Design a protein with these regions (language model features):
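Ala/Thr-enriched low-complexity intrinsically disordered regions
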Residues: 6, 15-16
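Short solvent-exposed beta->alpha transition segments
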Residues: 63-136
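Exposed beta-sheet edge and beta->alpha loop/turn motif
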Residues: 104-177
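N-terminal secretory signal peptides that target proteins for export/translocation
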Residues: 1-9
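Short, low-complexity N-terminal intrinsically disordered segments enriched in polar/charged residues
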Residues: 28-59, 68-76
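Bacterial N-terminal signal peptides
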Residues: 16-24
Length: 177
């Protein structure tokens, strides 16, 4: 009979422990996206500058940091149309900042969730002609805003050479799941 009681006592301890794991631990980890991804120092500096511009609503800086156009693409523009492209790009940046601010509120901060860097050489003509040669970094950041507290920001950054500066080639915002 003593062995039966010990078995029952052990089972109740095990059941209590499993109940603790199943019921109490999931709420403790809910909402965690995992640790921040690491990015190269120059990429982190770019992100800080980019998101500081969002925080201060510095449209001119955001315009300067946005929309990559390769030298090959620039050379294909007819005379005078490159300035039209820049004006159109700058208007789009302004509209996007206004739209995101209206929908999400003021920017509060960010963290990098995922980052992937790929180098595309000029010799890889298909890729280089499609998205440009250089160092491409794709990021997903979790941004915090005043209205809808979290949004995921997808950024595709490019820099033409190791020593050049990053620029935003493409981006999108969406409410975090």
């Amino acid at each position: 009979m003593a062995k039966q009681q010990t078995g029952l006592i052990n089972r109740s301890y095990i059941a209590t422990f499993l109940l603790f794991l199943v019921v109490l631990l999931p709420p403790c980890t809910k909402g965690k996206e995992g640790p921040s991804a690491s990015v190269p120092t120059d990429c982190q500096q770019f992100l800080d500058k980019y998101f500081d511009a969002w925080k201060s609503k510095d449209i001119a800086t955001l315009q300067a940091l946005s929309f990559y156009l390769s030298p090959q693409d620039q050379s294909r523009f007819p005379a005078g149309s490159l300035e039209l492209w820049r004006a159109s790009k700058n208007n789009l940046v302004t509209e996007n900042v206004e739209h995101v601010t209206r929908d999400f509120g003021d920017f509060k901060g960010y963290e990098v969730l995922r980052a992937k860097t790929t180098t595309i050489s000029p010799q890889d003509q298909v890729a280089a002609n499609t998205i440009g040669s250089g160092i491409h970094t794709e990021l997903v950041c979790k941004a915090r805003f005043s209205k809808k507290h979290d949004a995921h920001v997808g950024l595709h950054l490019i820099k033409e050479t190791e020593g050049s500066q990053y620029i935003v080639a493409a981006w999108n915002f969406q409410a975090a799941p």
